[in-house]
Every structure is written in C-alpha cells, then in structure tokens.
UniProtKB/Swiss-Prot annotation:
<dbReference type="Pfam" id="PF00022">
    <property type="entry name" value="Actin"/>
</dbReference>
<comment type="similarity">
    <text>Belongs to the actin family.</text>
</comment>
<dbReference type="GO" id="GO:0005737">
    <property type="term" value="C:cytoplasm"/>
</dbReference>
<protein>
    <recommendedName>
        <fullName>Actin-2</fullName>
        <ecNumber>3.6.4.-</ecNumber>
    </recommendedName>
</protein>
<keyword id="KW-0547">Nucleotide-binding</keyword>
<comment type="function">
    <text>Actins are highly conserved proteins that are involved in various types of cell motility and are ubiquitously expressed in all eukaryotic cells.</text>
</comment>
<dbReference type="InterPro" id="IPR020902">
    <property type="entry name" value="Actin/actin-like_CS"/>
</dbReference>
<keyword id="KW-0206">Cytoskeleton</keyword>
<dbReference type="InterPro" id="IPR004000">
    <property type="entry name" value="Actin"/>
</dbReference>
<dbReference type="GO" id="GO:0005524">
    <property type="term" value="F:ATP binding"/>
</dbReference>
<dbReference type="GO" id="GO:0005856">
    <property type="term" value="C:cytoskeleton"/>
</dbReference>
<keyword id="KW-0963">Cytoplasm</keyword>
<dbReference type="InterPro" id="IPR004001">
    <property type="entry name" value="Actin_CS"/>
</dbReference>
<dbReference type="InterPro" id="IPR043129">
    <property type="entry name" value="ATPase_NBD"/>
</dbReference>
<keyword id="KW-0378">Hydrolase</keyword>
<keyword id="KW-0067">ATP-binding</keyword>
<dbReference type="GO" id="GO:0016787">
    <property type="term" value="F:hydrolase activity"/>
</dbReference>
Amino acid sequence: MSMEEDIAALVIDNASGMCKAGFAGDDAPRAVFPSIVGRPRHQGIMVGMGQKDSYVGDEAQSKRGILTLRYPIEHGIVTNWDDMEKIWHHTFYNELRVAPEEHPVLLTEAPLNPKSNREKMTQIMFETFNAPAFYVSIQAVLSLYASGRTTGIVLDSGDGVTHTVPIYEGYSLPHAILRLDMAGRDLTDYLMRILAERGHSFTTTAEREIVRDIKEKLCYTGLDFEQEMQTAAQSSALEKSYELPDGQVITVGNERFRAPEALFQPSFLGLESAGIHETTYNSIMKCDVDIRKDLYSNIVMSGGTTMYPGIADRMQKEITALAPSSMKIKIVAPPERKYSVWIGGSILASLSTFQQMWISKQEYDESGPSIVHRKCF
C-alpha cells in the first residue's frame, strides 16, 4: 500500500520504564514519559473535583502521593493490557495529539516476546484504535539500524530488563538471545540500599525517584573496581554533593561507582547470573563460529542503563579478557543511545522500501491477529 507523503507514521517504543513516541522521519521522539498508570488510593471526598479514575505518565508521577502506581510492562513484556491500552490512548490523544485511525503505527517489542502478546498488540491497534496500518519490530534490531549497521550484537539495557541480541544481516538469531533480569530499576534499588548504609534513608516510591535522579546524575562505571575503592577510601576526590528537594545536601562517595558495578558483578544484588560482559560473550559463543568475528567488532550499546560514563571502556576491557587474543573488539556507544530504539524505528518507518511491509487494515480483517507472524519478523 502506498502511504501519502503528508501522513507520517507514528513510532512508539514501549519500554518498561519510559515510553518514547513521535513521528517517523523525526530525529528524536516528541514525547518521552514514564510507562506508569496511577489509580487513586482513596475515593474522592470533594464532590465536583473531577477526579479521574486513572492517570498516566507524568501526571501520575506528579500526583504519586495519592495514587497507587503500576507499571504495565514488566521486564520488557506487557503484563497488564488494560493499563497498556490507557498508555497508548494517552500517547495518541494527549502526547502526540493525533487520530490513530489516520496514521500507520510502528510499535516495538522485547526480544523473545511471546507470540500471543504480538497478536494482542496487533488486535488492539486495529480494533480499539482503528489504525490503517501496523507493524511491530524488535527493539534491539532497531538500535542496530540506528547505528547504521545490519550485523552486530546489541546489548540493550533499560529500566526493566537487559538483553544481548546477536543480529546477522538484519535478522535476530533467537537461539542466541540472552535475557538478564537486571536493569536500571534494580540499580536504583541497590543505590537506595547502599545510601541507607550511609544514613540516608529513602523508602517510598516518591523517594525512589530522587534516588533515580542521583543515579542518573552522579553514577559512573569504574575501569578497575578495586582501584576505585582504594581511591575512594584514601581521598575525597571522588565525592560529589547532591541537593535533595527539601534543600538538604548529601555527599555521595563510592556509591557513585558501586551501584553500576552490579552490571558486571550481579552478586552485589544477590543474583547468581553472569554480568553484562559475560552474557555478551556467551551470546556470541551461541552463534555460528563464522559470524563471531563480525559480532565482536560490532558490539552496540543501547538503552538508558548503558549511559554511565566509562561503561564502554570497561566493556572493552572485559570482553578483551574473554575473547580469543587476536580478536578485534569494538564497542559502539552512540551518544543518543538512550533513544536509539526509537530512532531506529523512525528510520525504518520512513524508508520507501519499507512501505510494502506494513500490515494493512484489510489484511488484518482477512486473516486476523496471526497475520503479524507472517509479516513481522
């Protein structure tokens, strides 16, 4: 089907922590908001206050004191469809201010997303929102496109889940995809714990957001953990101060690199899994021996949890230690990697060669939700 020039496709990246949405062809998403739905904890007392039965995104975040907050996407997979529908409704009508029945919609999905989930997404887009056309794409594959490659291994780490996804000539290799249930949310929790050791107690969901901000502004990945610990113990060179919303100033020291270190040493969180470096290596080793060289030289980082300063150098060091000694290793960490899934979607949906890939409303009406497995891979 040919798309009219002026009708831009909508690109929506639904991640565990933040939803990114905008128009195909743009270089950044127009809307980025938390993937949260909040419902009032108590019945409204004041009559006529127009209290809504649910709030989404930033509004839910700002009213969090009176709401129960729920994330409908857990570990990258949608687990609550009613709440998910609210997030999509909010995306179309409040954030982008578009009529979904007028635009093709590209959604993203986690690697290894269950088949029933893809069908449900397809059904909701066509039946609830009456989209004229639809497509669903794997997040890591889009990140790779955004880096200008079609072959490589993507380490995608967001708020809810981390995946290593080997991709060859544009196709992900499902047998070699590995999932780590450790990501930004866990690092925030860990930072809350180690700040408590210093006497700074953060407990509520509202205070957790403060800790997330500390994490994003002050944390970094050390090249050599033991070395950093020594430096921190001997001097105050690594200390930084942070002002809390009430004006109190706290000092953050070795917590700055101890929290992100858990990515390489999950035992810090009480997890028995391999770190991100080892998981990446294991993923490569599950691939055919002939393509490993191409993967080692194209290790692409994506997602907010790969944004720590120093993480690429550390990754280079760790992979070099695991790989064969003659292997050329290249870590690619684009500055815009927080949004590279969305950017890849924007690129894909605006390619002229992609226009025949859309699932049209007509095809959906003829075949039903299972059409998604034939057209999107």
